[in-house]
Amino acid sequence: MSFNYSMNTPSPSMLSFDMDIPITAFLHNSDVFQLFHPDIMEQVVVNKERVFFPTPSFNVLNLESDCLYKMSLRFDKTNNKRFQFNRQTKQWTEYDKVSNHKESEVFVHPSEIRTGDDWMKSPVEFFIKVTNLRSSESDEVICLESQCKYQPTLLIQKVFRDCFGCFQAHGPPVEIKFALLTFIATTRYCSRRIADIKSSLNPFSSQDTKKKNKRNTLKAVSQEENQPIENSSFHQSFSNQYLSKPDLDLKSTTLLQIAPDHSFEPTNFVSSSHFPCWDSIFCQQSFPTPSSSPYSDSLPHFTNEWNTPTFYNENFMSYPNFPNY
C-alpha cells in the first residue's frame, strides 16, 4: 500500500501493513526543495560519481520502539519517455524517444537495521552518489539514465530475526512518495534558475571553489614575494642558521661576504659559473669542510672594486661551521 502525496501536502502520513500503527514520515528539509517549485529539479549525472544534492532528510514517527526496521530510498521512473529542455519556454517536455527499460534502483541506508526508537531520534539523511555509468556495480552508487524523470520513494521495511539469526522481512514495506523530490537526470544543468539555486545552497559549488582558489593563489604569490629563498632542505637550513637579512636571494648574482660574527653582506661579483666552489652551494651539493684547520684558503672572496678574487685567511675571519648535507 502506498500513497503519492501532492506538493500541497508537505507532511504525508501512511498506515503500516498491519493497519494498527500509523507510520508518519515528513520531509525534514522540505523548505529547501520548495525553492525549486514550480520548476522540476535537475540532478547532474555523468560518468564520475556525484552526490545527490540537496540531500533528502526525513523525520519518521510512530514506529514501534522495540521493533527492527530498515530504511531505503528507491528511484522510480515516472514513465519510459525521455525529456528535452525547451530553451524558449524554459520547460522540460516529453518526446517520442523511449528510454531503456531498467529496474528501479534502490539505495539502502548505511545504518541498515535499527530499532524504531533509534530511527525516530533524529532525521534520517540519505547521502547518495549517482552516475550514468552502467558498469558501476557498487551498492553505494545509484545508476540513473539521463533525460529521464525520477520519483524517489521512501521505503520503511519492518524486519525480524529468524531462528538462524538472519533478518527476514515482516510483510511488505511502507512506501511514501514526495512530489517535491521529483527530478530529471541530465548531464548538465539546463535551467539557469535551478543552477543558481543549487549554487547558492552548495558551499562546494564550482563558482565558490573558483573564487576560493583565486584567493589562495593570490595569497601564495604574496607569500612567495616575501620569501625569496627556495623551499628546499638546503636553502631552508642555510637561511635559518646564517642569513641575517631576509631580503637576500641565493639565485641572484650576489656573493655573501662572511663577517667574523657570521653575518652576511652582499657584494656584487661576476657570474658564479666561473667558480665551481660557489656553484656547489647553489646546486645544493655538499659544502667542503676543512679537515685540519677551521680556516680555509680555498674559498674565493671579492672585496675590491675590480671584482678580482681574494681568499680567506686566518687573520681576516673565521670559517663558519656549515652543515653537511
Curated annotation (Swiss-Prot):
What does gene deletion cause?
Answer: Knockout causes abnormal development of the pharynx, when cultured at the restrictive temperature of 23 degrees Celsius, which is exacerbated on a ceh-51 mutant background. Embryonic arrest occurs on a ceh-51 mutant background. Expression of homeodomain protein ceh-51 in embryo is reduced; abolished by simultaneous RNAi-mediated knockdown of pop-1.
PROSITE patterns, sorted: TBOX_2, TBOX_3
Chain coiled-coil ranges:
none
Q: Residue spans with biased composition (Polar residues)? A: 219-236
Give me the positions annotated for DNA binding. Answer: 32-210
- The primary site where this protein sits is nucleus
Name recorded for this polypeptide: T-box transcription factor tbx-35
This protein's gene is called tbx-35
